[in-house]
C-alpha cells in the first residue's frame, strides 16, 4: 500500500470522481433495492430506461443542449465516429472539409477519406504550418461554403494542444463536426454553434464503452438509406437508442458523473477549477529555467493534457518512475511524442495537481 495518496494522470481511460466510485461500489450488487446490479439489468426494463432518461436529461442540462438537438449513447468509441460522421452527413456532397491539428484529427481525416465518395479537403494543417506546436486560427481555415461539414478536434490529447476559444464559423458556412472527447464538460460553449459533437466517454464523462453523440435534428435528413443501420444515426434515434443493446453500465456510470458535476456547480464552476489546475502546472514548467520543456505556443496549450519533457529521455524515464513511487501515476507521454503527459480532466482534484507540481520542483532540485 502506498504511503502517498494515489493520483491517476492517465489520458484515458482516466480518473473518475471518488464520490462516483463510492456510489457505484455501494450499488454494485443491489441497485436501488432491486437485488441485482445494473450490469445484470435488461436494457429494456423500466429501471434501465429511467437511468438512460436521467443521464440524457442531466447531460442536456449541463451543456444547455437546445431542443432541436438529439443525444445518443453509442458504442465503438470516437474512432468509429470518424467514419460514421462522414457516412451520415457527407452523402450527396462533392466535398467535406477537415482541419488537422494533431494526432487524432489526422487519423480522423485519413479515416474519413476512405469510406465516402465525397472528397475530404484539408482546410488547415497544423503539422505542416506549425509542426503541431501551434493551432491554425479559425479565420485562416480554407473552408468551402458548399462543403458538407468541417471536422476538427478542439483538444489534442497526444500533442497537448487546445483551442483557447471554442471555434465557431459564421452563418452560412457548413456545419461544424467536432471531436470533443477530451474536453467535453470541461468548459462552457454553445452547442448551437455545431452540427454534430461526439465524445468518447473515457476522459471527462465516464468509463470506456460509450460514446456520446449530439446531433442537430435537421442534419439527420442527410442520413442515407444504403448504409448499415448500425452506422446510421437515424436508425438509432428511430429506436430510441435501442437499435442494439447499449453499454448499460457505462451509461449508468456516466449518469453518476453528470450528477457529480451538477453537485460541483456545473460546467462553469468546474471550468474555473480546470483553469487553475492548468495554470499551476504551466507556471511550474515555465518557472523551471528550462529544466522542463513545453514548446507549445502559450495560446494553444491544452488545459486538459499538459505535455512536458526534460533534456534527456533517461531523465524522463527516471521522472516517471520516481513520480509513480510517490503516488503520481501514469505520467508517461504518448509513444510517438515521448516525455511526460499529465491529463487533468474534471475528476482530477486540485490537490493532485499541486502534489505533481511539488514533485516537479523537488525533482528539479535533485537533478537540475
Swiss-Prot record:
<feature type="binding site">
    <location>
        <position position="157"/>
    </location>
    <ligand>
        <name>pyridoxal 5'-phosphate</name>
    </ligand>
</feature>
<dbReference type="InterPro" id="IPR020578">
    <property type="entry name" value="Aminotrans_V_PyrdxlP_BS"/>
</dbReference>
<feature type="binding site">
    <location>
        <position position="104"/>
    </location>
    <ligand>
        <name>pyridoxal 5'-phosphate</name>
    </ligand>
</feature>
<dbReference type="GO" id="GO:0004648">
    <property type="term" value="F:O-phospho-L-serine:2-oxoglutarate aminotransferase activity"/>
</dbReference>
<comment type="function">
    <text>Catalyzes the reversible conversion of 3-phosphohydroxypyruvate to phosphoserine and of 3-hydroxy-2-oxo-4-phosphonooxybutanoate to phosphohydroxythreonine.</text>
</comment>
<dbReference type="InterPro" id="IPR000192">
    <property type="entry name" value="Aminotrans_V_dom"/>
</dbReference>
<comment type="similarity">
    <text>Belongs to the class-V pyridoxal-phosphate-dependent aminotransferase family. SerC subfamily.</text>
</comment>
<comment type="subunit">
    <text>Homodimer.</text>
</comment>
<dbReference type="InterPro" id="IPR015424">
    <property type="entry name" value="PyrdxlP-dep_Trfase"/>
</dbReference>
<feature type="binding site">
    <location>
        <position position="179"/>
    </location>
    <ligand>
        <name>pyridoxal 5'-phosphate</name>
    </ligand>
</feature>
<keyword id="KW-0032">Aminotransferase</keyword>
<keyword id="KW-0808">Transferase</keyword>
<comment type="pathway">
    <text>Cofactor biosynthesis; pyridoxine 5'-phosphate biosynthesis; pyridoxine 5'-phosphate from D-erythrose 4-phosphate: step 3/5.</text>
</comment>
<dbReference type="InterPro" id="IPR015422">
    <property type="entry name" value="PyrdxlP-dep_Trfase_small"/>
</dbReference>
<dbReference type="GO" id="GO:0008615">
    <property type="term" value="P:pyridoxine biosynthetic process"/>
</dbReference>
<feature type="binding site">
    <location>
        <position position="44"/>
    </location>
    <ligand>
        <name>L-glutamate</name>
    </ligand>
</feature>
<keyword id="KW-0664">Pyridoxine biosynthesis</keyword>
<comment type="pathway">
    <text>Amino-acid biosynthesis; L-serine biosynthesis; L-serine from 3-phospho-D-glycerate: step 2/3.</text>
</comment>
<keyword id="KW-0718">Serine biosynthesis</keyword>
<feature type="binding site">
    <location>
        <begin position="78"/>
        <end position="79"/>
    </location>
    <ligand>
        <name>pyridoxal 5'-phosphate</name>
    </ligand>
</feature>
<feature type="binding site">
    <location>
        <position position="202"/>
    </location>
    <ligand>
        <name>pyridoxal 5'-phosphate</name>
    </ligand>
</feature>
<feature type="binding site">
    <location>
        <begin position="244"/>
        <end position="245"/>
    </location>
    <ligand>
        <name>pyridoxal 5'-phosphate</name>
    </ligand>
</feature>
<dbReference type="InterPro" id="IPR022278">
    <property type="entry name" value="Pser_aminoTfrase"/>
</dbReference>
<keyword id="KW-0663">Pyridoxal phosphate</keyword>
<keyword id="KW-0963">Cytoplasm</keyword>
<keyword id="KW-0028">Amino-acid biosynthesis</keyword>
<dbReference type="GO" id="GO:0005737">
    <property type="term" value="C:cytoplasm"/>
</dbReference>
<dbReference type="GO" id="GO:0006564">
    <property type="term" value="P:L-serine biosynthetic process"/>
</dbReference>
<feature type="modified residue" description="N6-(pyridoxal phosphate)lysine">
    <location>
        <position position="203"/>
    </location>
</feature>
<dbReference type="Pfam" id="PF00266">
    <property type="entry name" value="Aminotran_5"/>
</dbReference>
<dbReference type="InterPro" id="IPR015421">
    <property type="entry name" value="PyrdxlP-dep_Trfase_major"/>
</dbReference>
<dbReference type="GO" id="GO:0030170">
    <property type="term" value="F:pyridoxal phosphate binding"/>
</dbReference>
<protein>
    <recommendedName>
        <fullName>Phosphoserine aminotransferase</fullName>
        <ecNumber>2.6.1.52</ecNumber>
    </recommendedName>
</protein>
Amino acid at each position: 500500500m502506498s504511503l502517498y495518496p494515489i493520483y491517476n494522470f492517465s489520458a484515458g481511460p482516466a480518473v473518475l470522481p471518488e464520490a462516483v466510485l463510492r456510489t457505484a461500489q455501494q450499488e454494485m450488487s443491489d441497485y436501488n433495492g432491486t437485488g441485482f446490479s445494473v450490469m445484470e439489468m435488461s436494457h429494456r426494463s423500466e429501471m434501465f430506461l429511467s437511468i438512460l432518461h436521467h443521464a440524457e436529461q442531466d447531460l442536456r442540462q449541463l451543456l444547455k443542449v437546445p431542443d432541436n438537438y438529439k443525444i445518443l449513447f453509442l458504442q465503438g468509441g470516437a474512432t468509429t465516429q470518424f467514419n460514421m460522421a462522414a457516412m451520415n452527413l457527407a452523402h450527396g456532397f462533392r466535398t467535406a472539409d477537415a482541419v488537422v491539428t494533431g494526432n487524432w484529427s489526422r487519423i480522423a481525416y485519413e479515416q474519413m477519406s476512405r469510406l465516402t465518395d465525397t472528397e475530404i479537403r484539408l482546410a488547415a494543417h497544423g503539422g505542416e504550418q506549425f509542426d503541431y506546436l501551434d493551432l491554425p486560427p479559425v479565420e485562416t481555415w480554407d473552408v468551402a461554403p458548399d462543403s458538407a461539414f468541417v471536422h476538427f478536434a478542439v483538444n489534442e490529447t497526444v500533442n497537448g494542444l487546445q483551442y483557447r476559444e471554442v471555434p465557431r464559423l459564421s452563418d452560412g458556412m457548413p456545419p461544424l463536426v467536432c471531436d470533443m472527447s477530451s474536453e467535453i464538460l470541461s468548459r462552457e460553449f454553445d452547442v448551437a454553434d455545431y452540427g454534430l459533437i461526439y465524445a468518447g466517454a473515457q476522459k471527462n464523462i465516464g468509463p470506456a464503452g460509450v460514446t456520446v453523440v449530439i446531433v442537430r435534428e435537421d442534419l439527420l435528413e442527410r442520413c442515407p438509406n444504403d448504409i448499415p443501420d448500425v452506422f446510421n444515426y437515424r436508425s438509432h434515434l428511430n429506436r430510441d437508442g435501442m437499435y442494439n443493446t447499449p453499454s448499460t453500465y457505462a451509461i449508468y456510470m456516466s449518469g453518476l458523473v453528470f450528477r457529480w458535476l451538477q453537485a460541483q456547480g456545473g460546467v462553469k464552476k468546474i471550468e474555473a477549477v480546470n483553469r487553475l489546475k492548468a495554470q499551476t502546472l504551466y507556471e511550474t514548467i515555465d518557472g523551471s529555467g528550462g529544466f522542463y520543456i513545453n514548446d507549445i505556443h502559450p495560446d494553444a496549450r491544452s488545459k486538459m493534457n499538459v505535455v512536458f519533457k526534460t533534456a534527456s529521455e533517461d531523465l524522463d524515464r527516471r521522472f516517471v518512475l520516481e513520480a509513480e513511487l510517490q503516488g503520481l501515476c501514469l505520467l508517461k507521454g504518448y509513444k510517438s511524442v515521448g516525455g511526460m503527459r499529465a491529463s487533468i480532466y474534471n475528476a482530477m482534484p486540485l490537490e493532485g495537481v499541486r502534489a505533481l507540481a511539488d514533485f516537479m520542483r523537488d525533482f528539479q532540485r535533485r537533478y537540475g
